[in-house]
Regions:
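Compositionally biased, low-structure terminal segments
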Residues: 14-16, 182, 246
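Alpha-helix boundary/interfacial micro-motifs
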Residues: 14-15, 19, 61, 260-261, ...
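Gly/Pro-enriched, hydrophobic low-complexity segments
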Residues: 186-192, 208-313
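Residues embedded in well-ordered secondary-structure elements
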Residues: 8, 13, 27-29, 204, ...
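Structured extracytoplasmic
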Residues: 22-212, 217-226, 297-314
Length: 314
């Protein structure tokens, strides 16, 4: 479980932008946003503080995952693993029907595995894939209060780790206690950390019809190499619905290296509306991570949720 928590600390967050990507096969070909111009934003009297406060105080993003239990839907999950030359050496494809009409049922419509996916004991080769299953297959079966104090671990080791996992995903900007060497590096909205980042915001259109703001936080280009190397979050992009200022998407680009581990990851989560309820529609991940005495892990995910239908009696 500790290894899963560490991995997730290196791979959270959200929304594809013009950042540095790992040069290999990318399963995500779904384009969702068209940008307009920064000029439109200035006329709206918006400022950086309003966007940051919205990110810190938002609860709707996690609630969208909680809302999934009220719906039946189809999930298509694709996982790719890579060798040291970034050639695909393993594939997983799952098409799953999640049925919440009455007692919850999960039906595999398609289940395909190719290449080096499992160990001899039947467990996944990569902690990356194990993390993926643990978090996103169970996202709407857990409780989470974004602004609650960090867990003291009294609920048991596993429960403490789960609290950290959920905080990393759904409440960016908070420090994560109990994760050595990187727990404080997620706290990017402090006065000290803000001096290292540029902030820009644009107007755009999401899914061809939803008017949105795109708020981007990125490392200043004129910093020294030493300073840049010490900043874990290279870029954080958040998509806001103009009509209600709720968050529809998040993207993060993270890279960090020290004596204990080395990672380079990008992750994206997107939402949409079904019967006026916000629900997750796409999750993507590209990442490499490495730590001593273990094989370097290289993987990408594409998760698409579709055909949401309100479950009977929900």
């Amino acid at each position: 479980m500790k290894k899963i928590v560490l991995l997730l600390a290196l791979s959270i967050f959200f929304f594809k932008a013009n950042s540095q990507e790992i040069p290999r096969f990318n399963p995500d070909t779904i384009k969702t946003i068209q940008l307009d111009s920064v000029v439109v934003i200035k006329a709206q009297r918006l400022n950086v503080e309003r966007f940051i406060n919205a990110i810190i105080n938002d609860t709707s993003f996690y609630q969208a995952f909680r809302n999934m239990k009220k719906f039946s839907f189809i999930a298509e999950n694709r996982i790719y693993t890579y060798d040291k030359n970034n050639k695909v050496d393993g594939k997983v494809y799952r098409k799953i029907k999640h049925n919440n009409d009455g007692p919850y049922k999960m039906e595999y419509l398609v289940k395909e595995d190719n290449g080096k996916i499992y160990k001899k004991n039947g467990k996944y080769q990569l902690y990356t894939v194990e993390m993926f299953d643990f978090i996103f297959m169970n996202a709407y079966n857990t409780d989470f209060v974004p602004n609650a104090p960090a867990s003291d671990g009294k609920g048991g080791t596993n429960e403490s780790y789960k609290d950290k996992l959920k905080t990393l995903i759904f409440n960016p900007g908070r420090p994560i206690k109990g994760l050595p060497f990187i727990g404080g590096k997620t706290q990017i909205f402090t006065a000290n950390m803000r001096q290292y980042y540029d902030y820009t915001f644009y107007s755009g259109t999401y899914l061809d019809s939803i008017p949105v703001y795109r708020f981007k936080i990125s490392v200043k280009p004129d910093l020294s190499s030493w300073t840049k190397d010490g900043l874990m979050i290279k870029e954080l992009v958040t998509i806001f619905d103009k009509r209600n200022f709720e968050i529809l998407g998040r993207y993060v680009d993270m890279k960090y290296s020290n004596m204990l581990f080395d990672f380079d990851v990008q992750m994206n989560i997107e939402m949409s509306y079904f019967d006026e309820v916000k629900l997750p529609t796409k999750i993507t991940y590209q990442g490499n991570w490495d730590y001593p005495f273990k094989k370097e892990e290289r993987a990408s995910f594409l998760v698409v949720h579709k055909d949401y239908k309100l479950a009977r009696g929900k």
